[in-house]
Amino acid sequence: MRSFVFTGLLLTLFCVHASPSAPQTDAALWPANPTNQAWPVTQPLNPPEGLRPCCAFGYNLKAEALGVPVPFYQLGNVIDTQHLGEHHYNDSNLGAVTNLLGINSEKVGLIYTRRGGFIDLAHVRDTADNTFYLFSQILPQLGQRWRIDLQPELALRRIQFTEFTAPADPAERYALATYLAGKLAFQLAAWHEIAQWYGFQSVPGFSEGVSAFSPEDLYSNLLGAHLAIQTILTGHAQSVSEFNQAMTDLLPTALAQLDAVSVTETRVQFDLLDGNWWDSHKRVPEKFLVLKRNYDTSDDRLPTPVPDETLPPQRLGLPDNIDSYPLSALAALQLWPGSDRGTLPPSKMYFTAADFAMLALQARSADAQQILQKR
């Protein structure tokens, strides 16, 4: 992957100088009401550098390479709210390396929550970062026709922005840019699940099919969008360091609201689902190490229901409209397949979020047939 030189963090002031409020921890699971404040904002950021390396569903996972078991390797995969570490905006490949080596102060892993099911912290953090990145790009150009091109995932990922009359009020512009960024960041996450299923490999020769549509993935991504929106709307997008600190503070509170459990209890939940949701006898990256998948790509969703859980699930959703502005009319994620399109079906020119349900349904049907053939 290309490495990016990080841009300076000079502040552009959009309104009066005011101290940002603390993230609203009592409302962490649902984005705050549109702000009446246009806070100072960092200069446009470089995009996050790839995705954090985590996690196949399960724990103490073994691995193989080219069909040969890798000895003495186990992926613990489980974390609790006491050991989340410090959030770091992922603008360097160094973050991925330090995560793999276990020396990053930011921690990732899976945690079971009684109201949100399993949560993958890498997915939470990745979508939070993408929301912050997109917000920093969108706000200065809100209402203009322009585009962002991102690194390919089976297709060139392009966000095309539409020309429109943006709100005159700075606070309304700030809120509109925030929610639009969260919406698009979640769509990028949904496409990543689709791309993994249809053959995307971030490391050539290493299949990512095991991770595609994993039951916890997109709910975790949606949680990340929520937390970033909350962080931005409460004035913590003034610099990368301030965003990092706000996310560090907000994440454990959000997990507590979802009734997160201990490492031991998370492992117990995995054990109860062994043979139904995952197969502890298989190795990463065998696709059917994961037996249970969630093919819903909507940004209004419940967690994948875990058998015998008695607490009511927490629904998460993103708005389709802010005031009189339909978000889908302001920007569109376009996926332009190139020569390396995996097994993606033919498209007219490009895919959009409107095609996600169809692509996911085809994946679900194919997986069901494969599982039947293996029985």
Residue ranges and their predicted role:
Residues 19-210, 229-375:
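Bulky hydrophobic segments
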